[in-house]
Every structure is written in C-alpha cells, then in structure tokens.
Swiss-Prot record:
Name used for this protein in its record: L-galactono-1,4-lactone dehydrogenase, mitochondrial
Cofactor(s) listed in the protein's UniProt record: FAD
pH sensitivity of activity: Optimum pH is 8.8.
Organism per entry: Arabidopsis thaliana
PANTHER family: D-ARABINONO-1,4-LACTONE OXIDASE, L-GULONOLACTONE OXIDASE
Length: 610
C-alpha cells in the first residue's frame, strides 16, 4: 500500500511539472478570427480579464523540503494505518509489532543447537525426564498421541543428528551411576551421564573406560548410538564396550538386551542412531585405571610408510595429524607407563611460549597486512585479549578469520602450525582420560570417513594411499584446507550399523577427518566457509570414497539437498548396511516413528508398502 501511494504522488508531481509548459503552446483558436456557421457571423466573446501576477517562485531548498516532508508524512501515515488495520488475537500478541522493540519469543519455545552452531532447531516439545518411570510414561503417551520425541544427547554431533523441530527427549537429568562391579570391572549407568562425569565417579573403584573420543562431554547414550570411537588398532569403537542395555521402546515398552538376551537386536540397537528406542541404562565393560605416556613427534609421509606397520602394532593408541601444504606429519602415540623404567625423564626442548611464538609473529604480521588492505575495517585485535594470553588453537582461529578462503593465507597458517608442532615434540604423562583428549579448536565443519585398512598383522597400506590422494586433491584444487587432517584406527565392531562393522575379528579400520573452522560470527562469512567446505567434502566423496570403500561417521554425515544425490546416498548406504533389518526393527519397536527425525527418515526411508 505504501509503495502504491508513493507511486501515485510521484506521478502526480511529475504531471504537475508539465502544466506551465502547456501555456506556451499556441492554440489554433484566435479570439480575433470570425467564425461562420450556416451563414451567420458570430462575434467572439470578449477577452478574459488579465490574470493576477503569479507569486514569486519558492527557492529550490523550500520546494525540496516540502516534497520530502510530504513523503515522510505519507510513510508514517501508511505505517500506522497498516498496523491498526490488522489486529491479532489475544493468543498471538507476541507476534505484534512493537515500535523500537524486538517481538519476544514464546516462553515455551526451546532453541537447541549443536556445539558448532551449524544446526539449530526450535521446539515447544522438549522433555527431560528425571527417572525411568517418567521416561516410560513419556514414551508411552507420545506413542499413543503420535508425538515425536527424538532422543538428543549433549548436542555435540557435528551434523545435529539428534535434533528435531517436532520434539525431543533429553536424559541429562538421568545421570546416575547405578551399580559398580569392581571384580568384573563393569559399571551400570543411566544413559544421560556424561563421559567425564562417569570417569570421575568410578576412578575411586580403580576403573576407567577402555577408550575415549576427543572430547568428554558426550552423554553415554549418545556416544554409543552414533558409533563414536577413539584410536588404537587393537581397540574397537565405543559401542563394543556395551555389555547390556535397557531400551524404552514405543511399541513394546522397556526391554533389556544383551549378548545373551536377543543378541541380534542387541547388536543392531547398540549403534541404533536413536531410532529403535530411547537408551535408558547401559552396562559397560571397563578396564583398570591406568596412566599413559604420550609421545608427540614430527615426521613425514616417506618415513611413516617405512614404520607404519610397527606403529600400528606396537602402540596401544596412535594417530597421525597431517598438515596440508606441508610435508609435516605429527605422530602421537600413547602407551601405559612402564612398570620397570617408569615415565621418560626427557624434558621438552622448548617452552610453550617458544612453541607458540612463530604463530604469534605471523598473527602480528597478518593483522598489519590486512589492516592496510582494508583501512576502514576494525582492527582484528581491537578490544580483545593480548595475544600473549591466547592458546595455539585460539591464535589459529584468529589467523584463519582474517582470510579463511584464501588458500595462500591458509597455507601460511598451516606452515606456522607445522613449526608449532616441531617445537612441541616431547612426552606427557597422565591418566588415560586426561591424555587421550584433544583440543579440537573452535566451531567447525567436519567430515570423517571410515574404511577398511587390512589387518593388524598385514596392513593394506590403503590408509596411507588415501592420505596421499587427499593431499594431491587439496593442492590441485587449491582448497583452503586448514590443519589437521586427522587419521585414527580402530579394530572392528560387531554392531551392523557401525561404519567399522566386520565379521572378521582381525580387520582394522582407518578413520580420516577433514575440517574447516568457523572462526567468525559474521553470517555471510560463515556461509561462504560452509559452501567451500561442502565443495571440499564433495570432491573427497567423488574421488575417494568409492575407491576406498569409505563411509561417513553417522554423527558427521550430511543430507544432500539435491534429489539425485540423496538417492545415490541411500543406495550407497543400502549397499553397506542392513537397511531392511533396521527398518524392520523400527516398524516393530516404533511403528509411528516418534523417535525418528528428518535425517533418519532420509537415510533409512521406510517403504509405504512394507
């Protein structure tokens, strides 16, 4: 309405400016001519009286003022008229526009996002039961009413696999240790307990978990359902630590599963992606609490090839961190402290400050360079802590934020990171839950693929071939790929939905993760980084995954928007995993699919004729 009114006024004004010029056009009619009609002579009318002289013209500034004052008045009037012309019902007052105020969100609307801020939903149906009875009642009622309650853990999955706008259930309040069997080294816990919380609770019993992922804030239910893993070619993914579990299902109520009780469903549900039931309780096989010696040193791919078999077999835990656009490979091994020689006595050659200094120097140099390039831009280090106080990963984020999609700039940052690791070589001793953690950096996009790598006795070397091809791809396509490319290994899993599933006990699997950080809050820049990451991921998928039989980690897989790409992904998943068996179990345990979400439905489409 406002636009049409403005257009009318503009047209009228334009027409008005033409009226004076019309008086300058001479008419063909003259009062001094004689008009003849049927032989009669008509006397023309007397001339009109002279017009009064026009008022003196307004100055240009006065005319402009009146014009824009009129526009302003019209805009205000139109806005007020629009506002009062569309009343809202009482129950929708939060939607009403309020002058100079943001409309508040409803109090019952929950915003839930993953830790990287890459996936977010809002829902009014967010449930946190306090005990098993509450959970059972919630699942039963939701099943009867066909209300969705997708299980969600700590929200740490990079792809937000637990999120659903329709509704969620979170077990953060069900976080108790229920039983500890010190002799058998087993512990029974509620599934909402966090990994670090569990480790702290059982350390007085002399127990700990067999292996850990990079971080400790996951809920136990979530970490097993998505097939999370640590590293060590003799150690399986974390779902293999599950001895038995209690599953609250919509159709069959609470069922107990173990290797003895319905082993087929037990193995299927261990890594069940939250689609077969809400994991309420878990019994885990633990190990004696122990200290580890971590050895970090820098190598290169040529040297790694010579020692790879020994590195896999001789170390309890091992991982490689590759730094794109350099020859640097950071090798990290972890082994129990020797009972005879004790921890190593070697002291580091460099202090932490000395190790980080090269990165600090590059940051100082870079902010000067980018300030000169864009003098109107606020200095990146304004109103921020002194760079002497920043950790290496924080400095890396700030460096990348300056020009995250420039491959030359990213390569310089990677070279500085390689220098940091060269000066960080050495040993570290601590409890296993402290040593096996890893500072992953800030918010990020990540993709991790898993593929077979032979056996421990006879590695196929496909894992190193994969890395060689990946590094060539990065350099050929000038991908602004930051560090690290992380490579880890596990033994096989007996859970059919696990990417590391195998029926052969000796098989080992390699896990390779690529990354792009989101070191900025600027939405446009985050979108540009996101687009570049998905281009990076698409290239690796196209050129490497089929060649190496690689499949993505369930917590890192992303659903394609393109219909043909989605169909190709579904066909690929069906080739590797028992989709029909999984969907059959879903139909039996959750016929209304209240535990599902869009991601599960797209990955495991259920036939309507089944």
């Amino acid at each position: 309405m406002l636009r049409s009114l403005l257009l009318r006024r503009s047209v009228g004004h334009s027409l008005g400016t033409l009226s004076p010029s019309s008086s300058t056009i001479r008419s063909s009619f003259s009062p001094h001519r004689t008009l003849c009609t049927t032989g009669q002579t008509l006397t023309p009318p007397p001339p009109p009286p002279p017009r009064p002289p026009p008022p003196p013209p307004a100055t240009a500034s006065e005319a402009q003022f009146r014009k824009y004052a009129g526009y302003a008045a019209l805009a205000i009037f139109s806005g007020v008229a629009t506002y009062f012309s569309f009343p809202f019902p009482e129950n929708a007052k939060h939607k009403k526009a309020q002058i100079f105020r943001y409309a508040p969100l409803p109090e019952d609307l929950h915003t839930v996002s993953n830790w990287s801020g890459t996936h977010e939903v809002q829902t009014r149906n967010f449930n946190q039961p306090e005990n098993l009875a509450d959970l059972e009642a919630l699942v039963k009622e939701s099943h009867e009413k066909k209300l969705r309650i997708r299980p969600v853990g700590s929200g740490l999955s990079p792809n937000g696999i637990g999120l659903s706008r329709s509704g969620m259930v979170n077990l953060a309040l069900m976080d108790k240790v229920l039983e500890v069997d010190k002799e058998k080294k087993r512990v029974t816990v509620q599934a909402g307990i966090r990994v670090q919380q569990l480790v702290d609770a059982i350390k007085d019993y002399g127990l700990t978990l067999q292996n850990f992922a990079s971080i400790r804030e996951q809920q136990i239910g979530g970490i097993i359902q998505v097939g999370a893993h640590g590293t060590g070619a003799r150690l399986p993914p974390i779902d293999e630590q599950v001895i038995s579990m209690k599953l609250v299902t919509p159709a069959k109520g609470t069922i107990e599963l173990s290797r003895e009780k319905d082993p087929e469903l037990f193995h299927l549900a261990r890594c069940g992606l939250g689609g077969l039931g809400v994991v309420a309780e878990v019994t885990l096989q633990c190990v004696a609490r122990h200290e580890l010696v971590e050895h970090t040193y820098v190598s290169n791919l040529q040297e790694i090839k010579k020692n790879h078999k020994k590195l896999l077999s001789a170390n309890k835990h091992v991982k490689y961190l590759y730094i794109p656009y350099t020859d640097t490979v950071v090798v990290v091994t972890c082994n129990p402290v020797s009972k005879w020689s004790g921890p190593p006595k070697d002291k580091p050659k460099y202090t932490t400050d000395e190790a980080v200094q090269h990165v600090r120097d590059l940051y100082r140099e870079s902010i000067v360079k980018y300030r000169v390039q864009d003098s109107g831009k606020k200095s990146p280090d304004s109103s921020e802590p002194d760079i002497q106080e920043l950790s290496f990963t924080e400095l890396r984020d700030k460096l990348l934020a300056l020009d995250p999609l420039n491959d030359v700039h990213v390569a310089k940052v990677n070279q500085a990171e390689a220098e940091f690791w060269k000066k960080s070589e050495g040993y570290r001793v601590g409890w296993s839950d402290e040593i096996l953690g890893f500072d992953c950096g800030g918010q990020q996009w990540v993709s991790e693929s898993c593929f077979p790598a032979g056996t421990l006795a006879n590695p196929s070397m496909k894992d190193l071939e994969y890395i060689e091809e990946l590094k060539k791809l990065i350099e050929k396509e000038a991908i602004p790929a930051p560090a690290p490319i992380e490579q880890r290994w596990t033994a096989r899993s007996k859970s059919p939905i696990s990417p590391a599933f195998s029926t052969s006990e000796d098989d080992i699997f390699s896990w390779v993760g690529i990354i792009m950080y989101l070191p900025t809050a600027d939405p446009r820049q985050r979108k540009d980084i996101t687009d570049e990451f998905f281009h990076y991921r698409h290239l690796t998928q196209k050129q490497l995954w089929d060649q190496f039989s690689a499949y993505e980690h369930w917590a890192k897989i992303e659903i394609p928007k393109d219909k043909e790409e989605l169909e190709a992904l579904q066909a690929r998943i069906r080739k590797r995993f028992p989709v029909d068996a999984y969907n059959k179990a879903r139909r039996e345990l959750d016929p209304n699919r209240i535990l599902s979400n869009n991601m599960v439905e797209k990955l495991f489409p259920v036939s309507t004729t089944a």
